[in-house]
Structures are given as structure tokens and as C-alpha cells.
Amino acid sequence: MSNSIVHDVTLQVELTNGNDGRGNKWFSSAKIRKSMESLLFGHSRTPWDFPTRVVVTRILGPGQRLWDSSSILRGNWKEIEDALVCLGWWHDDGPKWIEKTEGEQDASQRDNGPAVRVQVYRTES
């Protein structure tokens, strides 16, 4: 599999881990997605016409601790991803366009955090 980076951006959005729970109310996540879409409005683009792999890096802010690795993508990343789909990054968030999403953390840039870095790679089998 060949991977070449096609987009690399740091968004001034705090990645949450979802420890506060979501319950079974869909409108809560819809509200978060709309809020993220408004925050990220300047990042609109034309969708990629090829499959991608996404690396999401949580950039820690001052005083924040590293999470368990399984917590990185379980919080508000889904709403951020949905907002980016609405802003034209992908046609949709299905496996045809996003084959894989990986989560990482970076404690070396605390002056820039909290933030989330999104790296999009073109994937070809």
C-alpha cells in the first residue's frame, strides 16, 4: 500500500475523550457536529476522489495529561469528522473514502494546544 500525504492541518479545537457520556440522545452529537462545522467553516474544500487514511493527533495543552490510547478517537472526533464531511473534505465518512483512522497524542507542543492535527494520506492498494 502506498501512502502520500495530501493534507496536513492543525485545527484549534480540543479533542475530548467522551468520559462524560452521551446517553442515547442523537441530537447531542448533532449539536456538537453543527458547532464544530461553524468553528471549522474556513476549512471548506472539494472532496478527494480517492480513498484516504487519516491520522488524528491530539495536541495537549498546558496541564493536560496523556490518555489511554483507546480514548483518543472515542470522544468528539466523530463529530469533527462529520463536520469536515459537511465542509467537503470527503464525499462521506464511509470506508470507500476513509479506509482507516489512527489516533495519536503529542505532548511536545503544549504552547499550541489544546488542538487537533489532522493528516490525510492518499491510499492505494
Task: Map each language-model feature to its residues.
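Catalytic phosphate/metal-binding cores of nucleic-acid and nucleotide-processing enzymes, i.e., regions
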Residues: 1-125
